[in-house]
C-alpha cells in the first residue's frame, strides 16, 4: 500500500480529540513536510534549471493534476503573470475536469488518460515544452497520460508525488518523490501531501523566474502595476534599490512608463529610457547584467 494511504498511528483517536488537540496534531504533522522535502532539493533545483533552459528557448510549462493536486497546479500558474509579467500562455495549469473542477468535485475525471492528451494537443504542446505532473499517489491516470504523452513527443517532464517508486516517477525525466507519510485522516492528501506539492511548485516557479531575471536583488521588478497596492509597492522598490525619495521614485516611474526595471536602470546609470530598453534587451531582461553591460561601455 502507498504510504499516503497508510494509517497514521498518531491520529487513530482523532474523532475523540477536542479542537485544540486536532489543530496541534495537524501543526506537528505539517512541520514534517519541509524535512521531507530536504532530500529532494537537488532534484527540484535540476527541474528549475530545466524550466529555465526551455523557457529561454521559447518553450512553455504545463502543470497537470487532478483534484487537490490540479487545483494547486492551477493556483501556482495563475500567480505568475501578475508577479513576473510572463504571458499567460507560458505557464499553464491543467486540471482533470477542466476549470469547473476548480470550484466543484469532479473526481471521476482523474481516471481519463485521453482527455489530458487532447488538452495538451489543443495547446500545441511540443518537445520544446515542459510537463510537470502533480499527483500525490504517483498513479493518477490523468497525470500518467500527460507524462506518457510528454515522453512520447520528447518534451521535458517532471513529476511531483508523495510516495516512493511511483508510476509517475518512472515516466518522468526528473522524479520528485517526497515521503510525506500517512495523513491524520487516512488518504486525505489535501493535507501534508498538498502542502508539499504547493511548496515544491513555489520553489520551481520562483527559482525559475529568479534565474530568468524576473527579480532584481529580492524585489519583484517585473510585476504588473494592476492596482494601488502594487503601484505603491513599485514606489517602495524604487526607493529600496536606488535610494530615491518617494516623490523622486514616483517621477522615475512616470518617466519609465511604469517600467520598474527601466526606472531602476535609468536612476542608477543616468541613462535614457531608450538606452535602458536596449541594454535590458541585450541581457534578456536581467537588470543587474544590463547595468553591468552599460557600465562596461556597451
UniProtKB/Swiss-Prot annotation:
One Gene Ontology term from the biological process aspect of the record: peptidoglycan turnover
InterPro entries in UniProt: Etherase_MurQ, MURQ/GCKR, SIS_dom, SIS_dom_sf
Domain SIS: 51-214
Record's keyword annotation contains rRNA-binding: no
SUPFAM superfamilies attached to this UniProt entry: SIS domain (SSF53697)
Matching CDD domains: SIS_Etherase, UBA_TAP-C_like
UniProt protein name: N-acetylmuramic acid 6-phosphate etherase 2
Enzyme nomenclature, EC number: 4.2.1.126
Lineage: Bacteria, Bacillati, Bacillota, Bacilli, Bacillales
Note: A lyase-type mechanism (elimination/hydration) is suggested for the cleavage of the lactyl ether bond of MurNAc 6-phosphate, with the formation of an alpha,beta-unsaturated aldehyde intermediate with (E)-stereochemistry, followed by the syn addition of water to give product.
UniProt gene name: murQ2
Gene Ontology terms for molecular function: carbohydrate derivative binding; carbon-oxygen lyase activity; ether hydrolase activity
The keyword Lyase is assigned to this record: yes
Cited NCBIfam families: N-acetylmuramic acid 6-phosphate etherase (TIGR00274), PRK05441.1 (NF003915), PRK12570.1 (NF009222)
The reaction(s) this protein catalyses: N-acetyl-D-muramate 6-phosphate + H2O = N-acetyl-D-glucosamine 6-phosphate + (R)-lactate
Keyword vocabulary terms for this entry: Carbohydrate metabolism, Lyase
Pathway(s) of this molecule: Amino-sugar metabolism; N-acetylmuramate degradation
Function: Specifically catalyzes the cleavage of the D-lactyl ether substituent of MurNAc 6-phosphate, producing GlcNAc 6-phosphate and D-lactate.
Family the entry assigns: Belongs to the GCKR-like family. MurNAc-6-P etherase subfamily.
Cited Gene3D superfamilies: 1.10.8.1080, Glucose-6-phosphate isomerase like protein, domain 1 (3.40.50.10490)
Catalytic residues as annotated in Swiss-Prot or TrEMBL: 79, 110
Record text on subunit structure and interactions: Homodimer.
Source species: Bacillus licheniformis (strain ATCC 14580 / DSM 13 / JCM 2505 / CCUG 7422 / NBRC 12200 / NCIMB 9375 / NCTC 10341 / NRRL NRS-1264 / Gibson 46)
